[in-house]
């Protein structure tokens, strides 16, 4: 599991502690850049984020202009699963709010991208200037039915 945060899932915790699940934590910006690089065909990049921490353990480092950087490799996947607000039957996608943070780059980093949309429209109904992910990156699209967002842990009274 490569993640920036793994929450408080008891099953996840048990699998990690018994050794059946491997975990690699990345700072959020580094994780985003690894995914973006994978989608762009860039094999690796250097970042100063994480130098001198557990994040850097076992990774190649290099000094540039007196500053140490960590070599991070790109991430890509066989499948990318994204959720968009609206999409057309050609796979063009529009995201809303924070869904614009990771979904567009995730779509580029998957060999096969599967998109769930709240509203599926005909080709030509989306304003091209509003499209965040072009259909070239989407191989499967469907309209979802249920959008329940559970609270992970209540932190306010």
Question: Which positions does each model-derived feature cover?
Answer:
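Conserved alpha/beta enzyme-core scaffold
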Residues: 1-157
């Amino acid at each position: 599991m490569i993640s920036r945060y793994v929450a408080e899932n008891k099953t996840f915790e048990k699998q990690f502690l018994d050794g059946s699940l491997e975990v690699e934590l990345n700072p959020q910006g580094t994780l985003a850049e690894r995914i973006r690089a994978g989608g762009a065909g860039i094999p690796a990049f250097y970042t100063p984020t994480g130098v001198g921490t557990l994040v850097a353990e076992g990774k190649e480092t290099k000094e540039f202009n007196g500053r140490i950087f960590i070599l991070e490799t790109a991430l890509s996947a066989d499948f990318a699963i994204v959720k968009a607000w609206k999409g057309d039957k050609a796979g063009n996608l529009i995201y809303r709010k924070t869904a614009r943070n990771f979904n567009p780059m995730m779509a580029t980093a998957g060999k096969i991208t599967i998109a769930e949309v709240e509203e599926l429209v005909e080709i030509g109904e989306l304003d091209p200037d509003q499209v965040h992910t072009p259909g070239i990156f989407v191989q499967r699209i469907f309209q979802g039915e249920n959008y329940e967002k559970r609270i992970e842990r209540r932190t306010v009274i």
